[in-house]
Swiss-Prot record:
Protein name: Probable cutinase 1
Glycosylation site list: N202
Principal cellular location given in the protein's record: secreted
UniProt-listed InterPro entries: AB_hydrolase_fold (IPR029058), Cutinase/axe (IPR000675), CUTINASE_1 (IPR043580), CUTINASE_2 (IPR043579), Cutinase_monf (IPR011150)
Coiled coil: none
First and last residue of the signal peptide: 1-18
Keyword Oxidoreductase: no
Molecular function GO terms recorded: cutinase activity
Disulfide bonds: C36-C114, C62-C75, C176-C183
Active site: S125, D180, H193
Cell location: Secreted
Length: 211
């Protein structure tokens, strides 16, 4: 399994995603450093991905939300405490507690700093496990502010029964590509695990339908 996860890092480098780097760099820390916006998007990237939003799906959803709702969206990636290391995939929760706590803290920050914002969220690969761990234990008042969550290549899909525990299924959409074995409870990485850029438009539409 370690070989399979190491293969993910190599495949990610070999399969770059075209993104606006300047826009992504600005967008990745907006909850912490910027003003409140009507919509706050919180995202956890996959293992070995750079920056706060990663490269596979986070920047795409962030930018699509901003294009659909100009001047109304703040994007926040989970980090820097969450380092998206490979080894944490082997832990019981599919990530480490530091990452889960940091993500939970960002949801709580959005709720306290911006009480009128509508929160949407997402995660890719290990980042999906981060979202499972963080959202399931949030106070109910904070959970109620989360209007929609999209998860790509969810490493906790099988273990948690295709849902985020203790969170409404109608506010969650999990994307599992055909042939992506991590969705079946393994850590075997196939090419399908890198295909989720294709789901960004649908995921964005889902989140917008909830706000």
């Amino acid at each position: 399994m370690k070989f399979a996860l190491l293969s993910l890092a190599a495949m990610a480098v070999a399969s770059p995603v075209a993104i606006d780097v300047r826009q992504t760099a600005i967008a990745g820390d907006e909850l912490r450093t910027g003003p409140c916006e009507p919509i706050t998007f919180i995202f956890a990237r996959g293992s070995t991905e750079p920056g706060l939003l990663g490269i596979t799906t986070g920047p795409g959803v962030c930018n699509a939300l901003k294009l659909s709702r100009p001047g109304q969206v703040a994007c926040q990636g989970v980090g820097p405490a969450y380092i998206a290391d490979l080894a944490s995939n082997f832990l019981p929760q599919g990530t480490n507690q530091i990452a889960i706590d940091e993500a939970a803290g960002l949801f709580k920050l959005a709720a306290s700093k911006c009480p009128n914002t509508k929160i949407v969220a997402g995660g890719y690969s290990q980042g999906a496990a981060v979202m499972h761990g963080a959202i399931r234990n949030l106070p109910s008042d904070v959970q109620n502010m989360i209007k929609g969550v999209v998860l790509f290549g969810d490493t906790r899909n099988k273990q948690d029964g295709g849902r985020i525990p203790n969170f409404p299924t109608d506010r969650t959409k999990i994307y599992c590509a055909f042939g992506d074995l991590v969705c079946d409870g393994t850590l075997i990485i196939t090419a399908a695990h890198l295909s989720y850029g294709d789901d960004v438009p649908n995921a964005t539409s889902f989140l917008l339908s909830k706000v």
